[in-house]
Amino acid sequence: QVVVPPAVEQGFISITVLKASGVSMDLDDFDRAGLFSEVRAKGLHEEIDAALLARRAAGDWKAFFRLAVEAKKNILISGATGSGKTSFSKGLIKLIPDHERILTIEDTRELVVPQRNRVHMMYAKDGKGLQKVGAKELLESALRMRPDRILLQELRDGTAFFY
């Protein structure tokens, strides 16, 4: 997977090498490898979800969002123009651990990501501009780039379906 300008920042190229595995395993192999040892009948994150609900009920929003970021929960931020959505996003991004691989998808470069393992991808809003790809195509590309997190700055039109 190679992403070059203008889909990424000028002066950067993102290269992700994917190697297909020649190994073919059956269920017994997966069992011996311990794949099923972490499977639970109920949700894997019951404790985290309960803690999030408790923080919400207590109105402890700072702790709520810290835990949500730590637990890699999807967070949707919405509001009117000028209401602070981007500023709030930047505050949450600071909570992401430094070792994680972060990909951003934006039509206008707004997000500041202090973590070093990051790729900023850009698309043309409404098909205008040098980039010939949209958010949907960049999202598909991002999934092949082994991200820990994908930060999609604006979600509009049918792209929401794919996210």
Predicted regions and their residues:
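Switch/coupling sub-region of P-loop NTPases
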Residues: 62-80, 91-163
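Conserved glycine(s) of the Walker
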Residues: 84
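Conserved Walker
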Residues: 87
